[in-house]
Regions:
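Basic-flanked hydrophobic alpha-helices used for secretion and membrane insertion
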Residues: 315-556
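Hydrophobic alpha-helical segments
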Residues: 113-257
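Short helix-loop junctions at transmembrane helix boundaries
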Residues: 40-54, 123-155, 212-230, 605-666
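Hydrophobic transmembrane helix bundles of membrane-integrated enzymes that assemble
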Residues: 200-221, 228-253, 285-318, 322-328, ...
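N-terminal Sec/SRP start-transfer signal
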Residues: 1-32, 196-201, 210, 245-294, ...
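Short cytosolic juxtamembrane segments of multi-pass membrane proteins
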Residues: 3-5, 180-194, 571-572, 662-666
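Hydrophobic alpha-helical transmembrane segments of multi-pass inner-membrane transport and secretion
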Residues: 18-48, 54-91, 111-125, 205, ...
Length: 666
């Protein structure tokens, strides 16, 4: 046979198998569209000379890798469903006289058609949708970009290469299946059921243990930086644990139900449990995949939408004042470190600021001037010791200030006796101990109810656990030395200023302060809220854009796996339920059995995904704090709304795919 005949035969095969091929082709086109648009955005077209473009391009570049990796895994997994459904077809071809090399050519042309259709339609849709999505991104980030022609040659090349390699892998996997199987095996392969699996007790126990450790990491308290490391560890443990529990734990549970004779020997339960048990090994991977993808959708959408909804709160949390100057001495590795700050340098800078405000006839609405010593230390209950760990995330940020400084900042009048101190700790209304040990010195903790805690705790960072210790005048340096073994090199200084003036005037004053610092050789840095607002919007707007993109991709993956699983199950169950009719079961009883099995299998991944999301809430809340989002209640509401919305979408998918299942079975 010549190649033209193979090409025509491949086209006919694809047309006749459209029930299975069309969903696969649509998923290919969808992933091509998403990857092409994200890669085009990552190329930076239209972002030239735009403030905040580096942030957007970094996020878009990260999204390109995420979507590309998922596309490869998802399309290979989807192809495995197609391969199973077509075993009988390929076996029939061989029995009718086609050799394996002929089937290889047929598969080649089918893969070529699918690849060409996916790329052609996908890139065309990507070009058309790019302009719309570019405008959406600009709206979310609050920036102004120039919409250029969306056809990026580099993005087209990357898309063709990625999906070309994916289709080559799928072609080789399908080819391997044909070459290692005999025609009779292929002819009956699509109809072969699973033998009743043995109870894998060790795997089930391992799954519970991994899930338990993952949940423990998510639920235990830690700093925000430590939470980021533990988040990825917890994800890995929960993913593996989920696969183990769905494959082994579900079988163990079904066998427990089977041993319960009063429950098992009911018509509805007998048929559904038996059917699920015999095929659970095959279903387990699909169910676990649906569960993990559903969890990904819930987490990604809830986090990204919450960050966007509270973006103004994030801005004011990160930049509580219009203008701020900071200079931190002696905390290398985790904060900006500057040369020692002296009293004289501080006064020179403040004098320069006052002179400029007087020249511009601007008045202060608020002014704060904090001077303290800062260090990282290990805190164990009421003991503060020099940090021994190389991991900064495991340490606590300690600020030591004198009572006169505290009184000046808060407006209170605290008088400490010799050996006394005030202690304020993050997230705690009152310090829980009567004494505090700073190295080799012990201080009595004075009870002091205050509503000024936020003035002395560096809550805007939200990264490290924070503790502030207030000592008597002239004792702060001694307290620092008791922990660190040496005196501090100089002050750490925070200066905050709010003006009676508009955004433009605030930016002008901020620029002038930067000039004053440069002329005074003062190695601090200035932050102006209105200047930094663009950066915040660029980051969180692009994160929302990416979150919705990735969430939609995960949702598409879950829907496709659900569809293929339902269709595959329908063909497997059709003969079984025909047998049930022949042995006397009514259509009503059969339909109840079908419904019981489908509902159980279908909604189990959703239930587990919701549990995963709820357990992950404390850990994700800490990560949100690191992103300067302190409102846990808003995050809780956003998560609840996301779960409810996803459940509705999941229910719609159930109704649609259940119809296909019932149509095949009945």
């Amino acid at each position: 046979m010549n190649n033209l005949l193979y090409a025509r035969l491949a086209k006919t095969n694809l047309s006749k198998n459209r029930q299975n091929i069309l969903p696969y082709l649509l998923s290919c086109i969808g992933t091509v569209v998403m990857f092409f648009i994200m890669d085009t955005l990552a190329q930076g077209s239209g972002f030239d000379s735009m403030i905040g473009k580096d942030t957007i391009l970094t996020v878009m570049g990260m999204g390109t890798y995420i979507i590309g990796l998922f596309a490869v895994i998802f399309l290979i997994y989807s192809n495995s469903f197609l391969a199973k459904r077509r075993k009988k077809e390929f076996g029939l071809f061989q029995i009718l006289g086609m050799e394996k090399k002929h089937l290889a050519k047929l598969l080649f042309f089918e893969s070529l058609y699918l690849w060409a259709a996916s790329l052609g339609i996908g890139i065309l849709l990507g070009v058309l949708l790019y302009r719309l999505l570019f405008l959406v991104l600009m709206k979310l980030t609050g920036l102004n970009g120039t919409i250029g022609f969306a056809f990026s040659a580099k993005a087209v090349g990357s898309t063709m290469l990625l999906f070309g390699l994916t289709f080559v892998i799928n072609f080789l996997l399908s080819l391997r299946q044909i070459h290692v199987s005999q025609p009779v095996e292929l002819l009956h392969g699509g109809a072969q059921g699973e033998r009743e699996p043995k109870t894998k007790l060790l795997t089930a126990v391992l799954g519970f243990m991994l899930l338990g450790v993952g949940y423990y990491l998510a639920l235990t308290r830690q700093s925000s930086m430590d939470a980021l490391d533990k988040f990825f560890n917890a994800i890995a443990l929960v993913m593996v644990g989920t696969y183990c529990l769905f494959s082994a734990g579900s079988i163990a549970f079904l066998k427990i139900l089977k041993k319960n004779k009063n429950y098992y020997y009911q018509t509805r339960h007998f048929t559904s449990i038996s059917g699920m048990l015999y095929r659970m090994k095959q279903n387990a991977v699909g169910l676990a995949n649906i569960c993990i993808l559903s969890t990904g959708v819930l987490l990604v959408i809830s986090i990204s939408t919450c960050l966007w909804t509270g973006i103004e709160e994030v801005t004011y949390t990160r930049f509580p004042h219009q203008i701020s100057i900071e200079a931190n001495t002696g905390v290398s590795g985790i904060m900006k470190t500057v040369e020692p700050v002296s009293q004289k340098m501080i006064e020179e800078v403040k004098t320069g600021i006052d002179q400029h405000l007087e020249e511009k006839q601007l008045r202060k609405k608020y002014e704060s001037d904090q001077r303290y010593y800062v260090m990282l230390a290990d805190v164990d209950r009421n003991k503060v010791e020099k940090t021994q760990s190389d991991d900064a995330a495991a340490s606590t940020l300690i600020k030591i200030m004198e009572e006169s400084e505290y009184n000046q900042v808060t407006g209170e009048q605290v008088e400490l006796e010799p050996g006394q101190a005030l202690v304020f700790q993050e997230k705690q209304k009152n310090y829980g101990y009567d004494t505090i040990e700073l190295g080799n010195q012990t201080y009595e903790v004075k009870k002091w109810n205050t509503d000024k805690k936020s003035y002395v705790l560096d809550e805007k960072t939200q990264v490290y656990e924070t503790m502030t210790v207030v000592t008597r005048n002239h004792e702060a340096k001694e307290a620092y030395a008791a922990v660190q073994g040496k005196e501090p090199e100089g002050y750490s200084w925070e200066y905050a200023l709010d003006l009676i003036g508009d955004a433009g005037e605030q930016i002008t004053v901020g620029n002038e302060i930067e000039t004053i610092l440069t002329e005074s050789s003062f190695n601090g840095w200035v932050e102006v809220r209105e200047k930094e607002r663009n950066t915040v919007y660029s980051l969180y707007g692009s994160l929302l854009f990416l979150g919705v993109f990735v969430g939609a991709l995960f949702l598409m993956g879950a829907v496709m796996i659900i569809y293929y699983k339902q269709v595959s199950e329908g063909f497997d169950d059709r003969k079984r339920f025909q047998i049930m009719q022949k042995v006397g079961m009514s259509r009503k009883e059969i339909r109840q059995t079908i419904q019981s099995q489908v509902v159980t299998v279908f909604f189990l991944p959703l239930a587990v995904a919701v549990v995963h999301t709820m357990v992950a809430f404390p850990l994700t809340r800490r990560i949100m704090a690191m992103l300067n989002f302190p409102d846990s209640n808003l995050f809780l509401v956003a998560t609840a709304i996301t779960i409810a919305a996803f459940a509705v979408v999941y229910l719609i998918v159930y109704v649609l795919t259940a119809r296909a299942y019932y149509k095949i079975v009945e």
